[in-house]
Design a protein with these regions (language model features):
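Secondary-structure boundary/capping signal
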Residues: 8, 128, 228, 269, ...
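Low-complexity, intrinsically disordered short segments enriched for Gly/Pro and polybasic residues
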Residues: 1, 16, 563-566
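Long, ordered, helix-rich scaffold segments
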Residues: 369, 386-391, 398-567
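Beta-propeller domains with acidic blade repeats across secreted/periplasmic ectodomains
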Residues: 19-418, 428-432, 436
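Bacterial N-terminal signal peptides
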Residues: 4-16
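A subset of signal/propeptide-processing and intrinsically disordered low-complexity segments
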Residues: 16-17, 455
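Generic recognition of cysteine residues
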Residues: 6-9, 142, 256, 474, ...
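Secreted/periplasmic carbohydrate-active enzymes, especially glycoside hydrolases
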Residues: 2-5, 140-142, 422-423, 464
Length: 567
């Protein structure tokens, strides 16, 4: 009955929204308190102000870390990129007189509102994507976009601010469109960082290993956090802005102009302006409706029981054109997801409400970046229009009323004890724990990772992949194989082949397990032992090969091994 009532209210409100949907809003700005009074959420939820001007500028992208802090890319300078004569160096690591920054917001007393702000990296040039992440040797850090590079900002001395600014990838395109740059950074399975490449810009991305990509306009790609490799994930879309994974490991995006949401299949091509497909057709569509908008920004996937069974497999989509947060229910037709329109999750009587990013924290709290403005269109209205607001921005916090109270501590990604999370019943938490161990391997996690891998169903391919990659990283640590007595573990045998250490070679020498379908197992095992094995291991393998060759008509395999060993 609640859904029927809510649906009726939604239908009644559509005409009102369309009537007020002008390119330049006719009303004036409201205070944060008055805007809050104009926002409506479903029964059972509460919305509150988390942060507003002057604590922040215009928020673009949001993220949370393991300590419950909210990271935000904040801009005042948009839409004008700082000229190169204001750059502190050729890389543009700092811009003079810039008010743009990556900020960290903290709710220290647990009342649901930020009471502490830190300009972690200031003097930036229209920052967009932000992902909290740091190397083990650093106190804090993030990966972020600031014209013209993807950066690693790190606090190395513990003062709470970035004193290291290092280019990961770049320079990349920004000159044609400052609202179509790199954004929506997400840490995914296997330790890759996924990102969107926006409308109209062209970028040639070169990684440290020599791999490169040329991207024009909308695309999604992924890269290693250290910039060692870059790969295209999917091609097309017009101006994707927003990425989200579901519990199965599927990746979804929000796009402007083509469709509000896509499931992104690796290697697939999606509709864009004037771009053909690759001859195989476009990736499957999952949505037929448009939510009455050409401008969609931000997406959050609800699953894993985070809001209860009635909210399982739903997506929330930011709609800054209609000043709403849309809702779709996802069902699967075979392996293809389909989106069915539901009543809007958030509506507003204030047409300045501009939700441009959504972030669902691990504790179930939804954060919304509100680019509060009279004008939202980048092309539809001149950039120098006096109605463009340059000072107001809000972040809203939405939580279920049931069990509301003090903020939970987020003890998953980046925790000192991710092993505990490996035994969680939530696949999302297990995947995040595996990702944490990829970045910070721990010797004591080898056995729990093997247990988690053995207990994970074969059909959960993304979680199994994350666990295998985490196990590979942990097995590179000295002594990691010392407590493994089993010699018939086929899964471990396949992983050990990717571990370039003498310990791995010694274990493989006595390994009896053969990975299923591994027709090239024997030559790969020999090559690994010859390259990484100690002299004792090489001698043992040579004796093994000679003994085997004595029973054959020729010693071809032994000769081949000797050639490998001498290489």
């Amino acid at each position: 009955m609640k859904w029927v009532f809510w649906w009726g209210c939604w239908l009644m409100g559509v005409s009102g929204v369309m009537a007020q949907d002008h390119l330049v809003r006719e009303t004036g700005p409201l205070s944060p308190e008055d805007e809050l009074a104009a926002l409506t959420v479903p029964e059972g939820f509460a919305i509150s102000l988390f942060a507003a001007e002057p604590m922040i500028g215009k928020p673009i992208n949001l993220a949370t870390d393991a300590r419950g802090r909210v990271w935000v890319s904040s801009t005042i300078e948009y839409p004008y990129a700082a000229a190169k004569d204001r750059w502190s160096d050729p890389q543009g690591s700092r811009v003079s007189d810039s008010r743009d920054a990556i900020k960290i917001l903290e709710d220290s007393d647990g009342d649901g509102r930020a009471d502490r702000v830190t300009d972690f990296a200031d003097g930036l040039n229209i920052p967009t994507g932000v992902l909290p992440w740091h190397r083990p040797e650093h106190r804090d850090g993030c990966i972020a976009w600031s014209i013209p590079n993807l950066w690693y900002f790190a606090d190395t001395d513990g003062d709470g601010k970035a004193d290291l600014r290092e280019v990961i990838l770049g320079p990349l395109g920004y000159e044609k469109d400052t609202h179509g740059m790199i954004s929506s950074l997400r840490l995914g399975p296997g330790g890759w960082v996924y990102a969107t490449h926006g409308f109209n810009n062209t970028s040639v991305i070169r990684a440290k290993d020599g791999t490169s990509l040329e991207l024009h306009s909308g695309n999604v790609f992924r890269f290693r956090p250290d910039g060692s490799r870059v790969e295209v994930w999917s091609r097309g879309q017009v101006n994707p802005f927003g990425l989200a994974f579901d519990r199965r490991g599927n990746l979804y995006s929000a796009d402007c102009h083509s469709a509000p949401v896509y499931q992104l299949i690796p290697g697939a091509v999606y509709p864009s302006f004037g771009k053909p497909h690759d001859g195989l057709g476009f990736g499957p569509a999952m949505i037929e409706h448009t939510h009455g908008s050409t401008g969609i920004a931000g997406i959050a996937f609800l699953d894993g029981g985070i809001w209860g069974p009635e909210w399982e497999d739903h997506v929330l989509i930011g709609n800054p054109v209609t000043s709403r947060v849309n809702l779709d229910r996802i069902h699967f037709a075979g392996t293809t997801p389909r989106a069915g329109e539901r009543p809007d999750f958030i509506t507003s009587r204030d047409p300045w409400f501009r939700p441009v990013d959504l972030h669902l924290a691990a504790d179930g709290t939804l954060y919304l970046a509100d680019f509060y403005n009279r004008i939202i269109g980048h092309y539809e209205v001149p950039l120098d229009h006096p109605g463009r607001d340059r000072e107001r921005g809000r972040i809203w916090r939405v939580a279920k009323k049931e069990g509301a109270g003090k903020r939970k501590r987020l003890e998953v990604l980046g925790t000192a004890d991710p092993v505990t999370a490996l035994s969680s019943t939530d696949p999302w938490e297990r995947r995040r724990a595996a990702e944490s161990l990829i970045e910070q391997p721990a010797l004591g996690s080898v056995t729990p990772l093997r247990t988690a891998l053995a207990e994970t169903p074969d059909e959960d391919t993304h979680l199994r992949h994350a666990l295998r990659v985490a196990l590979k990283h942990c097995l590179t640590l000295p002594g990691a194989f010392s407590g493994i007595d089993e010699k018939d573990d086929a899964d471990l045998a396949a992983i050990a082949l990717a571990v370039p250490t003498a310990d791995a070679a010694a274990w493989l020498l006595g390994c009896k397990g053969v990975p299923e379908g591994a027709t090239d197992w024997a030559p790969r095992r020999r090559a690994h032992l010859a390259k990484h094995g100690s002299p004792e291991v090489v001698a043992s393998l040579l004796a093994e090969e000679i003994a085997l060759s004595a029973n054959r008509e020729s010693a071809q395999d032994a000769d081949a091994f000797l050639g490998i060993a001498e290489a």
